[in-house]
Amino acid sequence: MMKLNLFINANETESYIDIHAPKMNDHVQSIINAVNDLDKSHTLVGYIDKEIHIINVSDVITFQVINKNVTAITSNQKFKLKLRLYELEKQLPQHFIRISKSEIVNKYYIEKLLLEPNGLIRMYLKDAHYTYSSRRFLKSIKERLSI
């Protein structure tokens, strides 16, 4: 059971969080990730032709580079973004995983994984398509998915 203490002090110049734990474990790490995600962007601006759309980041299945443009793919739309993939990666919550030079996936939309004989991971996503990880990102993917 986790204990929570809140201290309100008008003399404090900024808000901060201290975590006290007997050891680092998955529960503590998930709290750290949740706190870090508070500063991350939860909406993005995307474009379809000349229309401007506000996209909820949690609705995005994957971000892919298509024809040198970063594209946010949801279950029913594809939006062009004006960000580079590396810029986007810094803004996204922890549940987005870089799987290749040209793709970032939302781990909540990963349905299953297939380890290929060549060492790559084939990721089946909930929108009924699949994608491949690159070997360069394999170690990071395994760590982020705890496999």
Swiss-Prot record:
UniProt keywords (A-Z) are: Cytoplasm, DNA-binding, Transcription, Transcription regulation
Localization of this protein: Cytoplasm
Matching PROSITE patterns, A to Z? Answer: HTH_LYTTR
List the GO cellular component terms: cytoplasm
**Residue ranges of domain HTH LytTR-type in the record:** 44-147
A GO molecular function for this record? DNA binding
- A single Pfam family it belongs to is LytTR
Name-wise, this protein is Uncharacterized HTH-type transcriptional regulator SAR2449
Q: Which organism is it from?
A: Staphylococcus aureus (strain MRSA252)
